[in-house]
Amino acid sequence: MQLEQKSSLHCSKCRNFLQKFSQDMQAWNCRELDSPLPSDITLHNLEPARPDSGMSFSTDFDDDFFNLDLHQQERSASFGGVTQYSQQFLREKCSFSPYFHTSLETVDSGRTSLYGSNEQCGQLGGASSNGSTAMLHTPDGSNSHQTSFPSDFRMSESPDDTVSGKKTTTRRNAWGNMSYAELITTAIMASPEKRLTLAQVYEWMVQNVPYFRDKGDSNSSAGWKNSIRHNLSLHSRFMRIQNEGAGKSSWWVINPDAKPGRNPRRTRERSNTIETTTKAQLEKSRRGAKKRIKERALMGSLHSTLNGNSIAGSIQTISHDLYDDDSMQGAFDNVPSSFRPRTQSNLSIPGSSSRVSPAIGSDIYDDLEFPSWVGESVPAIPSDIVDRTDQMRIDATTHIGGVQIKQESKPIKTEPIAPPPSYHELNSVRGSCAQNPLLRNPIVPSTNFKPMPLPGAYGNYQNGGITPINWLSTSNSSPLPGIQSCGIVAAQHTVASSSALPIDLENLTLPDQPLMDTMDVDALIRHELSQAGGQHIHFDL
């Protein structure tokens, strides 16, 4: 609709222009006919008519519509292509044509919206073209002289980079151009002692880097603190030194042997090397040995309470045999003092109360079932008694009531007895014989004599007298009652100690042994069968 209106308007303007042009031509032709032109003047020599040369035009605003130069300048100004000639022509038009000045203001208003100010529109030559080019690169078009840089270009802060103008590939972090490692290095070098703890590195970050100032709380600081710990641990630039105080954090310093520049990550120690594997195994063995020693010490304390500290010596011996290497000596430095050295253990003392004995032929009895009383502690025979068996004598003199009585051996009808075994054979079977309850006490040989009745002590004296036969029978044994009682005691000593001991060993009292109090007959029979080895067993009833 607007296009049709413009077309009709143009048509009316054209008709008016043609009418006025025809009238002007007629008037000009009439004037020229009145004053003919000189013969030396041609149409090529004539200068173009100017509005200020005295020629008057009766034009209005509609005449500017057909000015082609004006339309060309307006079209060029709309696209920013103002040339030096067109700019000069516009200034000349502004000086003498009030109608064209209105149209120029319209063009300037359009350029103002494009470039931002009238001052920028007045620039000539290449400045305007540069401004239009800058507008295409600048999103907001606010500054026509600002040069747009690529997004990955880093604005260098050092003067060397500014002069050289070279492009770097360092990634720009949120806090600046420095990496975590560079920030940590700066923090350590800024400290007076050139060393910082991990907490001090955190504090320096919060105080000196603006990006971390509002991220110092526990919720928002977990990420960057974790990155700092990783950089300290993985980069060879940093080195950890143990703090002198107990329970304090380690110091972090700059490694003087590190290479300058971007340092590679620290290579972790491989745990599968021979040296590290050997050390790890030795340390593990030491810990295991200590643990086993403590457990055995606890068990030994329990057994010692029940059996008279009988297992403590064997624990020390076993622990010494398990780790006999010199490298394992450090594992036993902290062993409790209750463990005695091996030379003082119960195994080396024959007369101790321990049931632990040399394992001579002990494998024979591993599969046998022994009665419950066999496991009880059995006091061993003192070594000095065994060693002094050669001092035993037949003719022994006993002291009874301060009276020295010489014991004479009397012939007793007994069966022939085999000679006793040697000391080494006796010692080899002593462990098995000591466990047999029938062999614990000396066997008293059976005799044919009967104890003689005392005169006046029984029924013969009650009848009022003593018959000659009874008196004779009694008098043959002992003429006096006092002497008879002494003889009975002497006979008992003779039977009990058929082979008398030395005088300093006669009064030795051995511990009482439980004989038949809690005896299991079935277990005893099985034990005797296992000891006999298929031979006949005889029990003396």
Curated annotation (Swiss-Prot):
The modification Phosphothreonine is found at T273. One of its GO terms (molecular function) is ubiquitin-specific protease binding. Transmembrane segments: none annotated. Phosphorylated by akt-1 and/or akt-2. Phosphorylated by sgk-1. Phosphorylated by unc-43. Phosphorylated by jnk-1. Dephosphorylated by tax-6 in vitro. PROSITE patterns: FORK_HEAD_2 (PS00658), FORK_HEAD_3 (PS50039). Residues 118-150 have a biased composition (Polar residues). Keywords: Cytoplasm, Developmental protein, DNA-binding, Growth regulation, Immunity, Innate immunity, Nucleus, Phosphoprotein, Repressor, Stress response, Transcription, Transcription regulation, Ubl conjugation. GO terms for cellular component: cytoplasm; cytosol; nucleus. The modification Phosphoserine is found at S319. The keyword Ubl conjugation applies. Interacts with rle-1. Interacts with unc-43 and tax-6. Interacts with jnk-1. Interacts with ftt-2. Interacts with prmt-1. Interacts with hcf-1. This is Forkhead box protein O. It comes from Caenorhabditis elegans.
